[in-house]
Amino acid sequence: MNNNVNQTKWIKKVEENLKLRGRSQKTFDNYKSALLRFFNYYNEETNIKKLKEEDIINFVNDEYIKANKCKATYNTGVAAIRLLYLVCFNITLNKILLPSSKLIKRVPTILPRDKFLIIINNEESLKHKCWLILSFCSGLRVDEVAKVKVEDINSKEHKLKVLGKGNKERYTILPDITIKLLRLYCIRKNIRTGYLFPGSNNKEVMNSKTIINYFSVIKVDYNLDNNISFHSLRHAFATYYLANGGSLLALQSMLGHTDLNTTTIYLHLAQNFNELAGIKYV
Protein backbone atom coordinates (compact mmCIF):
# COMPACT_ATOMS: atom_id res chain seq x y z
CA MET A 1 0.00 0.00 0.00
CA ASN A 2 1.53 3.34 -1.02
CA ASN A 3 2.03 6.30 1.28
CA ASN A 4 -0.80 8.35 -0.24
CA VAL A 5 -3.33 5.63 0.59
CA ASN A 6 -1.90 5.29 4.09
CA GLN A 7 -2.02 9.02 4.63
CA THR A 8 -5.68 9.16 3.63
CA LYS A 9 -6.46 6.36 6.10
CA TRP A 10 -4.51 8.07 8.88
CA ILE A 11 -6.22 11.41 8.35
CA LYS A 12 -9.58 9.61 8.41
CA LYS A 13 -8.74 8.01 11.77
CA VAL A 14 -7.72 11.38 13.18
CA GLU A 15 -11.00 12.87 11.94
CA GLU A 16 -13.00 10.07 13.59
CA ASN A 17 -11.19 10.64 16.89
CA LEU A 18 -11.85 14.38 16.78
CA LYS A 19 -15.54 13.77 16.07
CA LEU A 20 -15.77 11.39 19.04
CA ARG A 21 -14.33 14.16 21.20
CA GLY A 22 -16.86 16.65 19.85
CA ARG A 23 -14.33 18.85 18.08
CA SER A 24 -15.46 21.17 15.29
CA GLN A 25 -15.00 20.84 11.54
CA LYS A 26 -12.70 23.85 11.70
CA THR A 27 -10.43 22.01 14.15
CA PHE A 28 -10.27 19.00 11.84
CA ASP A 29 -9.49 21.20 8.83
CA ASN A 30 -6.60 22.75 10.77
CA TYR A 31 -5.31 19.34 11.86
CA LYS A 32 -5.59 17.98 8.32
CA SER A 33 -3.62 20.93 6.94
CA ALA A 34 -0.93 20.39 9.59
CA LEU A 35 -0.69 16.66 8.83
CA LEU A 36 -0.41 17.24 5.08
CA ARG A 37 2.44 19.65 5.80
CA PHE A 38 4.05 16.92 7.89
CA PHE A 39 3.63 14.23 5.21
CA ASN A 40 4.87 16.49 2.41
CA TYR A 41 8.04 17.26 4.35
CA TYR A 42 9.27 13.71 3.71
CA ASN A 43 9.72 11.82 0.47
CA GLU A 44 7.37 9.03 -0.60
CA GLU A 45 9.73 6.28 0.59
CA THR A 46 9.79 7.56 4.18
CA ASN A 47 8.10 5.30 6.71
CA ILE A 48 6.21 7.83 8.82
CA LYS A 49 5.47 5.28 11.52
CA LYS A 50 9.16 4.54 12.09
CA LEU A 51 10.35 8.13 12.30
CA LYS A 52 12.39 8.90 15.41
CA GLU A 53 11.34 11.71 17.72
CA GLU A 54 14.44 13.66 16.69
CA ASP A 55 13.21 13.48 13.06
CA ILE A 56 9.86 14.94 14.10
CA ILE A 57 11.62 17.66 16.12
CA ASN A 58 13.67 18.56 13.04
CA PHE A 59 10.45 18.91 11.05
CA VAL A 60 8.93 21.17 13.71
CA ASN A 61 12.08 23.31 13.82
CA ASP A 62 12.18 23.70 10.04
CA GLU A 63 8.48 24.17 9.32
CA TYR A 64 7.33 26.12 12.36
CA ILE A 65 10.14 27.67 14.40
CA LYS A 66 12.57 28.67 11.63
CA ALA A 67 9.61 29.62 9.44
CA ASN A 68 8.50 31.97 12.24
CA LYS A 69 4.97 30.57 12.42
CA CYS A 70 2.73 31.94 15.16
CA LYS A 71 2.31 30.02 18.41
CA ALA A 72 -1.25 28.97 17.62
CA THR A 73 -0.15 27.43 14.29
CA TYR A 74 2.79 25.72 16.01
CA ASN A 75 0.52 24.27 18.71
CA THR A 76 -1.96 22.96 16.15
CA GLY A 77 0.85 21.28 14.22
CA VAL A 78 2.31 19.63 17.31
CA ALA A 79 -1.13 18.52 18.56
CA ALA A 80 -1.99 17.03 15.16
CA ILE A 81 1.24 15.02 15.03
CA ARG A 82 0.78 13.77 18.59
CA LEU A 83 -2.77 12.65 17.82
CA LEU A 84 -1.66 10.98 14.58
CA TYR A 85 0.90 8.83 16.37
CA LEU A 86 -1.44 8.03 19.24
CA VAL A 87 -4.55 6.95 17.30
CA CYS A 88 -2.83 5.45 14.24
CA PHE A 89 0.35 3.90 15.65
CA ASN A 90 -0.39 3.65 19.39
CA ILE A 91 2.74 5.71 20.07
CA THR A 92 2.80 8.46 22.71
CA LEU A 93 5.28 11.17 21.79
CA ASN A 94 7.38 12.79 24.51
CA LYS A 95 5.76 16.09 25.52
CA ILE A 96 9.04 17.34 26.97
CA LEU A 97 10.87 16.91 23.67
CA LEU A 98 7.87 18.13 21.69
CA PRO A 99 6.18 20.72 23.93
CA SER A 100 3.25 23.01 23.32
CA SER A 101 4.00 26.72 23.33
CA LYS A 102 2.24 28.93 25.86
CA LEU A 103 0.05 31.37 23.99
CA ILE A 104 0.17 35.05 24.78
CA LYS A 105 -3.33 36.28 25.55
CA ARG A 106 -4.23 39.16 23.31
CA VAL A 107 -6.62 41.89 24.31
CA PRO A 108 -9.87 41.22 22.43
CA THR A 109 -10.86 43.65 19.69
CA ILE A 110 -14.49 44.70 19.94
CA LEU A 111 -16.88 46.23 17.45
CA PRO A 112 -18.02 49.55 18.99
CA ARG A 113 -21.74 49.93 19.57
CA ASP A 114 -22.07 52.97 17.31
CA LYS A 115 -20.51 51.04 14.39
CA PHE A 116 -22.75 48.06 15.08
CA LEU A 117 -25.87 50.24 15.01
CA ILE A 118 -24.85 51.82 11.72
CA ILE A 119 -24.26 48.40 10.14
CA ILE A 120 -27.43 46.72 11.38
CA ASN A 121 -29.65 49.72 10.60
CA ASN A 122 -28.35 49.84 7.03
CA GLU A 123 -28.49 46.07 6.51
CA GLU A 124 -31.39 45.15 4.22
CA SER A 125 -31.28 41.37 4.71
CA LEU A 126 -33.28 40.18 7.71
CA LYS A 127 -31.18 37.03 7.86
CA HIS A 128 -27.96 39.03 8.06
CA LYS A 129 -29.44 41.22 10.78
CA CYS A 130 -30.16 38.05 12.78
CA TRP A 131 -26.59 36.80 12.39
CA LEU A 132 -25.19 40.08 13.65
CA ILE A 133 -27.54 40.53 16.57
CA LEU A 134 -27.19 36.95 17.85
CA SER A 135 -23.48 37.52 18.32
CA PHE A 136 -23.54 41.15 19.47
CA CYS A 137 -26.49 40.80 21.87
CA SER A 138 -26.17 37.16 22.98
CA GLY A 139 -22.46 36.40 22.58
CA LEU A 140 -22.62 33.53 20.09
CA ARG A 141 -19.60 32.30 18.16
CA VAL A 142 -19.97 32.10 14.39
CA ASP A 143 -20.40 28.29 14.44
CA GLU A 144 -23.04 28.65 17.14
CA VAL A 145 -25.03 31.18 15.13
CA ALA A 146 -25.17 28.71 12.24
CA LYS A 147 -26.55 25.96 14.54
CA VAL A 148 -29.40 27.89 16.18
CA LYS A 149 -32.75 26.09 15.98
CA VAL A 150 -36.28 27.37 16.51
CA GLU A 151 -36.58 24.97 19.46
CA ASP A 152 -33.61 26.66 21.17
CA ILE A 153 -35.48 29.95 21.57
CA ASN A 154 -37.29 30.56 24.85
CA SER A 155 -38.84 33.98 24.33
CA LYS A 156 -40.89 33.78 27.52
CA GLU A 157 -37.79 33.51 29.72
CA HIS A 158 -35.54 35.52 27.37
CA LYS A 159 -33.16 32.57 27.03
CA LEU A 160 -31.42 30.84 24.14
CA LYS A 161 -29.97 27.33 24.26
CA VAL A 162 -26.58 27.23 22.56
CA LEU A 163 -24.72 24.20 21.21
CA GLY A 164 -21.12 25.21 21.84
CA LYS A 165 -17.64 23.73 21.57
CA GLY A 166 -17.49 19.99 22.11
CA ASN A 167 -21.28 19.89 21.63
CA LYS A 168 -21.69 21.29 25.15
CA GLU A 169 -25.03 22.97 25.79
CA ARG A 170 -25.38 26.25 27.64
CA TYR A 171 -27.85 29.10 27.90
CA THR A 172 -27.44 32.78 27.13
CA ILE A 173 -29.72 35.80 27.25
CA LEU A 174 -32.11 36.95 24.54
CA PRO A 175 -32.92 40.69 24.66
CA ASP A 176 -36.34 41.86 23.47
CA ILE A 177 -34.81 43.35 20.33
CA THR A 178 -33.38 39.96 19.33
CA ILE A 179 -36.63 38.11 20.04
CA LYS A 180 -38.61 40.54 17.87
CA LEU A 181 -36.13 40.26 15.02
CA LEU A 182 -36.01 36.44 15.13
CA ARG A 183 -39.79 36.24 15.29
CA LEU A 184 -40.15 38.50 12.24
CA TYR A 185 -37.52 36.46 10.37
CA CYS A 186 -39.30 33.16 11.12
CA ILE A 187 -42.66 34.57 9.98
CA ARG A 188 -41.29 35.91 6.70
CA LYS A 189 -39.33 32.74 5.95
CA ASN A 190 -42.12 30.46 7.21
CA ILE A 191 -39.69 28.68 9.54
CA ARG A 192 -41.51 26.81 12.30
CA THR A 193 -39.02 24.16 13.34
CA GLY A 194 -35.40 23.11 12.83
CA TYR A 195 -32.48 25.33 11.90
CA LEU A 196 -33.07 29.06 11.63
CA PHE A 197 -30.44 29.26 8.91
CA PRO A 198 -30.51 25.89 7.11
CA GLY A 199 -28.06 24.77 4.47
CA SER A 200 -28.76 24.23 0.80
CA ASN A 201 -31.14 21.30 1.30
CA ASN A 202 -33.01 23.06 4.14
CA LYS A 203 -32.07 20.33 6.63
CA GLU A 204 -28.31 20.45 7.12
CA VAL A 205 -26.47 23.07 9.16
CA MET A 206 -25.42 26.11 7.18
CA ASN A 207 -21.66 26.37 6.67
CA SER A 208 -20.37 29.04 9.05
CA LYS A 209 -17.99 30.22 6.31
CA THR A 210 -21.06 31.81 4.71
CA ILE A 211 -21.29 34.16 7.70
CA ILE A 212 -17.55 34.80 7.73
CA ASN A 213 -17.56 35.66 4.02
CA TYR A 214 -20.51 38.01 4.55
CA PHE A 215 -18.69 39.80 7.35
CA SER A 216 -15.58 40.16 5.18
CA VAL A 217 -17.70 42.21 2.79
CA ILE A 218 -19.05 44.25 5.71
CA LYS A 219 -15.49 45.07 6.81
CA VAL A 220 -14.71 46.55 3.41
CA ASP A 221 -18.04 48.36 3.03
CA TYR A 222 -17.73 50.08 6.42
CA ASN A 223 -13.95 50.45 6.44
CA LEU A 224 -13.58 48.49 9.67
CA ASP A 225 -10.20 47.97 11.31
CA ASN A 226 -8.26 44.90 10.10
CA ASN A 227 -8.36 43.41 13.60
CA ILE A 228 -12.17 43.38 13.59
CA SER A 229 -13.76 40.02 12.82
CA PHE A 230 -17.17 38.44 13.36
CA HIS A 231 -15.84 37.24 16.71
CA SER A 232 -15.44 40.91 17.69
CA LEU A 233 -19.23 41.01 18.06
CA ARG A 234 -18.99 38.35 20.78
CA HIS A 235 -16.22 40.36 22.46
CA ALA A 236 -18.47 43.42 22.33
CA PHE A 237 -21.34 41.50 23.96
CA ALA A 238 -19.09 40.45 26.85
CA THR A 239 -17.61 43.91 27.31
CA TYR A 240 -20.90 45.79 27.23
CA TYR A 241 -22.58 43.21 29.47
CA LEU A 242 -20.01 43.84 32.20
CA ALA A 243 -20.10 47.59 31.56
CA ASN A 244 -23.83 47.40 32.29
CA GLY A 245 -23.05 45.85 35.68
CA GLY A 246 -23.52 42.22 34.68
CA SER A 247 -22.14 39.33 36.75
CA LEU A 248 -18.75 37.89 35.79
CA LEU A 249 -19.86 34.35 36.70
CA ALA A 250 -23.04 34.73 34.67
CA LEU A 251 -20.98 35.94 31.71
CA GLN A 252 -18.63 32.96 32.03
CA SER A 253 -21.63 30.64 31.81
CA MET A 254 -23.18 32.49 28.86
CA LEU A 255 -19.92 32.49 26.89
CA GLY A 256 -19.24 28.83 27.65
CA HIS A 257 -15.81 29.44 29.19
CA THR A 258 -14.41 26.55 31.24
CA ASP A 259 -11.87 28.79 32.98
CA LEU A 260 -13.01 32.00 34.70
CA ASN A 261 -9.62 33.56 33.90
CA THR A 262 -10.61 33.55 30.23
CA THR A 263 -13.62 35.70 31.09
CA THR A 264 -11.83 38.16 33.39
CA ILE A 265 -10.03 39.81 30.46
CA TYR A 266 -13.32 41.55 29.65
CA LEU A 267 -13.28 43.27 33.05
CA HIS A 268 -10.36 45.41 31.93
CA LEU A 269 -12.10 46.28 28.68
CA ALA A 270 -15.37 47.13 30.42
CA GLN A 271 -13.63 49.58 32.74
CA ASN A 272 -12.61 51.64 29.71
CA PHE A 273 -16.21 52.16 28.59
CA ASN A 274 -17.95 55.18 30.05
CA GLU A 275 -21.12 54.66 28.00
CA LEU A 276 -23.21 51.60 28.59
CA ALA A 277 -24.33 49.20 25.91
CA GLY A 278 -27.81 50.64 25.79
CA ILE A 279 -29.26 47.17 25.36
CA LYS A 280 -31.97 45.91 27.67
CA TYR A 281 -30.84 42.38 28.47
CA VAL A 282 -33.86 41.16 30.39
Predicted regions and their residues:
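Conserved catalytic core of the tyrosine transesterase superfamily
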Residues: 1-282
